[in-house]
Swiss-Prot record:
One of its GO terms (molecular function) is RNA polymerase binding. This is Transcription elongation factor GreA. The gene is greA. Keywords: DNA-binding, Transcription, Transcription regulation. Belongs to the GreA/GreB family. InterPro entries: GreA/GreB_C_sf, TF_GreA/GreB_CS, Tscrpt_elong_fac_GreA, Tscrpt_elong_fac_GreA/B, Tscrpt_elong_fac_GreA/B_C, Tscrpt_elong_fac_GreA/B_fam, Tscrpt_elong_fac_GreA/B_N, Tscrpt_elong_fac_GreA/B_N_sf. PROSITE patterns: GREAB_1, GREAB_2. One of its GO terms (biological process) is DNA-templated transcription elongation. It holds the Pfam family GreA_GreB. NCBIfam families: greA, PRK00226.1-2, PRK00226.1-4, PRK00226.1-5. It comes from Psychromonas ingrahamii (strain DSM 17664 / CCUG 51855 / 37). Necessary for efficient RNA polymerase transcription elongation past template-encoded arresting sites. The arresting sites in DNA have the property of trapping a certain fraction of elongating RNA polymerases that pass through, resulting in locked ternary complexes. Cleavage of the nascent transcript by cleavage factors such as GreA or GreB allows the resumption of elongation from the new 3'terminus. GreA releases sequences of 2 to 3 nucleotides.
């Protein structure tokens, strides 16, 4: 069985969502289905069909989260020997060599990635280029727009 890396924070968020789905969302949907059934003919009952569709999405998400958590390898970055290298969970500040544009990313699991808040997937091309590198190393990342050269100016290990 393949295990997928995940930060402790990412696992906690998934557990919280799972609890919400099981204790709040699922019972609300079951109640909505019961109420819709009371309205009679189910063939043309839009409320019933909408509630059943919600139930399908909810149950699918529950199964998805449970599978992710059961296959997750929770990595606590504070317990890893890093020797100053970029590793999973590291917060890395890089600067574009050409433009001097500076950006900070945290390398996280696939399910935690959110580029809007600078969380990049460990399997992304940028993260793959950063893993194993150290402070002041330069990397070249091939993008659809061409190759971009970056220099690592900071590596932090923040939980």
């Amino acid at each position: 069985m393949v295990q997928y890396p995940m930060t402790a924070n990412g696992a906690a968020k998934l557990r919280s969502e799972l609890k919400q789905l099981k204790t709040v969302t699922r019972p609300r949907i079951v109640k909505a289905i019961a109420e819709a059934r009371e309205h009679g003919d189910l063939k043309e009952n839009a409320e019933y069909h909408a509630a059943r569709e919600q139930q399908g999405f909810c149950e699918g998400r529950i199964q998805d989260i449970e599978a992710k958590l059961s296959n997750a390898r929770i990595i606590d970055i504070t317990n890893i020997t890093n020797n100053g290298k970029v590793i999973f969970g590291a917060t890395v500040t890089i600067v574009n060599v050409e433009t001097d544009a500076e950006v900070t990313y945290k390398i996280v699991g696939d399910d935690e990635a959110n580029i809007k808040i600078n969380l990049i997937s460990v399997s992304s091309p940028l993260a793959r280029g950063l893993i194993g590198k150290t402070l002041d190393d330069e990397i070249s990342i091939v993008t659809p727009g061409g190759t971009i050269d970056y220099e690592i100016i900071s590596v932090q290990y923040i939980a």
